């Protein structure tokens, strides 16, 4: 079979390794200009932060989107007269009518403008100006997508043929999922930065980026303020085995034998949700458990620690799938429910269940200490956070998905490990928490056709580590040629993970297909394995050079 000719490797360009540890959210005072209730921070020659607060309360803490504002000082000129303040770098010219709100209704250039040069012509921007030429970013999920029916959900990215883009980090500027960009503050109880309300919820907080067609520089400078894109552990560059199916321990052993027999280099083994009691007869759960579960289904996997050790002995890293929304039930392992009930003093529990409150520090600490630590001591390396319950929680405007990604990633970082998590996209700033799970797509040629575009535009918001269900997840149709082509695309996508729904007929194991398809799929997977040193080296070089 011919190889699919896609220039998707370009989507891996923004990958860099860095940490958020050395970030400083307080800008150098020499980069700041205050004019009444307005504050301007010159971050780069092309990027200016614009704040306005009627209360004169500006934000110097990190936020969900921006974590660093202390950049190398930029030469700029400032002058003012009775009516206007002017700020000019060698790339942008800002003009602000003193004593006014930069935003007008309807949007107009009356109170604030920024002028840039784009393709040899002057371009004027003002707050609220629409941009029909934005090259787009990404969206929360491809769940239920068939072809490009999610195209309209793509959020704006940081690059545009207009020559400018804006990050609106104001509290009132709700994200695409309806949530807000909270501030972050240290929390001694959990040991991580915790969400906090903004100083002035009505304040304007914009980051203007006037980079013209210097697209790489725009993304690179975004990561200077929003945090670098970490380099995950080396094993993520290989092939991930994944299937939603009620496998027993012996089934997993047979899969490992087939993988070895067929000489398929494999680095990650994912155990989907049937590892725990889920209430389904098909998984021998005896009406115990449900969509959410934390305790091993010992009918299928009677000796979990032994199985995980065997998987490790075969050279795989291990992830477990989680749907956490229903909390901790009393039918779970007594050590989980009782320990958390005791520590939380019944605070979040009723009717034999501890409700899900990851947005509160005492719950978070107890959950990680009792549930996550226990499974990781058994051999779990990372977690697949399969959150599908929307963007609402007890704290208005706080997206639980962002909380999951933030805390699971930081927790996975302990003991000096190179961290990672595996979850859906939760808005700008999510690039700090790789890897992304794009969701449940239909098995169609149209879905394959859209995936390279979707993967590439995500890098326009710095989000380079999408993991797709290669081959599609559900519905659609069975087509050997489609599976082979999708697998061939997969080796050039950021993460190579074949996956499928819980159907007898949807398995993506190469040995389930006719000979021609099997050989094409296995050749692709071996090719991906050969690329690991290159992929890792190039990403490492980029990280050391601090380039996007």
Where are these regions (language model features)?
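Catalytic and substrate-binding clefts that recognize carbohydrates or anionic sugar/phosphate headgroups
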Residues: 79-233, 243-244, 249, 256-261
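Mature N-terminal segment immediately following signal peptide/propeptide cleavage
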Residues: 29-51
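Carbohydrate-binding surfaces of carbohydrate-active enzymes
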Residues: 22-25, 33-34, 42, 258, ...
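A low-complexity, Ser/Thr/Gly/Pro-enriched, surface-exposed linker/loop concept
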Residues: 43-82
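Short alpha-helical segments and helix-capping/turn motifs at coil-helix boundaries
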Residues: 25-27, 33-36, 72-74, 80-82, ...
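Conserved, mostly hydrophobic/aromatic
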Residues: 91, 157, 259, 311, ...
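Aromatic- and carboxylate-enriched substrate-binding clefts and catalytic-loop regions
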Residues: 117, 125, 265-521
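Bacterial Sec-dependent N-terminal signal peptides
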Residues: 1-23
């Amino acid at each position: 079979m011919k190889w699919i000719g896609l220039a998707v490797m370009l989507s891996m360009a923004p990958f860099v390794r860095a940490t958020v540890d050395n970030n400083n959210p307080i800008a150098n005072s020499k980069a700041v200009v205050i004019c009444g209730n307005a504050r301007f921070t010159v971050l780069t020659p092309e990027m200016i932060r614009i704040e306005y607060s009627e209360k004169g309360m500006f934000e110097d803490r990190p936020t969900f989107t921006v974590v660093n504002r202390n950049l190398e000082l930029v030469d700029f000129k400032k002058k003012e007269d009775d009516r206007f303040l002017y700020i000019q770098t060698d790339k942008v010219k800002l003009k602000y009518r003193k004593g006014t709100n930069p935003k007008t209704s309807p949007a107009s250039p009356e109170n604030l403008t920024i002028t840039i040069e784009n393709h040899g012509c002057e371009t004027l921007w003002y707050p609220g100006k629409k941009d029909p030429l934005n090259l787009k970013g990404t969206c929360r999920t491809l769940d239920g997508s068939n072809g490009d029916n999610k195209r309209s959900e793509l959020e704006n990215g940081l690059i545009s043929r207009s020559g400018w883009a804006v990050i609106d980090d104001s509290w009132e500027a709700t994200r695409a999922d309806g949530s807000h960009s909270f501030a972050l503050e240290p929390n001694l109880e959990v040991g991580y930065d915790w969400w906090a309300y903004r100083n002035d919820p009505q304040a304007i907080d914009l980051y203007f980026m006037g980079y013209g067609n210097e697209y790489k520089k725009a993304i690179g400078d975004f990561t200077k303020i929003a945090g670098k894109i970490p380099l995950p552990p080396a094993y993520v560059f290989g092939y991930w085995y994944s299937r939603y199916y009620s496998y027993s321990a012996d089934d997993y052993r047979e899969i490992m034998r087939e993988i070895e027999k067929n000489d398929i280099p494999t680095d990650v083994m994912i155990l989907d949700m049937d590892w725990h009691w889920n209430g389904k007869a098909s998984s021998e759960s005896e009406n115990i458990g449900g969509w959410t579960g934390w305790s091993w289904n010992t009918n299928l996997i009677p000796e979990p620690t032994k199985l995980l050790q065997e998987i490790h002995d075969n050279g795989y890293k291990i992830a477990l799938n989680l749907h956490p929304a229903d909390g901790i039930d009393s039918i779970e392992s007594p050590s989980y429910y009782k320990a958390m009930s005791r520590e939380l003093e019944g605070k979040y529990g009723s009717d034999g269940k501890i409700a899900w409150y990851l947005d509160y520090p005492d719950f978070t600490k107890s959950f990680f200490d009792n549930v996550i630590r226990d499974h990781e001591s058994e051999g779990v390396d990372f977690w697949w956070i399969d959150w599908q319950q929307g963007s609402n929680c007890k704290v208005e405007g706080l997206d639980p998905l962002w909380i999951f990604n933030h805390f699971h990633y930081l927790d996975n970082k302990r003991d000096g490990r190179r961290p990672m998590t595996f979850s859906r996209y939760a808005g700008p700033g999510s690039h700090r928490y790789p890897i992304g799970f794009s969701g449940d797509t239909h098995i169609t040629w149209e879905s394959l056709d859209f995936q390279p575009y979707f993967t590439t535009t995500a890098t326009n918001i710095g989000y380079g580590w999408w993991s797709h269900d290669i081959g599609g997840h559900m519905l659609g149709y069975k087509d050997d040629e489609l599976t082979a082509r999708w697998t061939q695309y997969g080796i050039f996508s950021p993460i190579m993970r074949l996956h499928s729904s819980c159907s007898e007929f949807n398995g993506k194991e190469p040995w389930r297909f006719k000979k021609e398809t099997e050989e094409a799929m296995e050749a692709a997977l071996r090719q991906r394995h050969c690329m690991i040193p290159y992929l890792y080296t190039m990403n490492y070089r980029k990280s050391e050079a601090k380039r996007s």
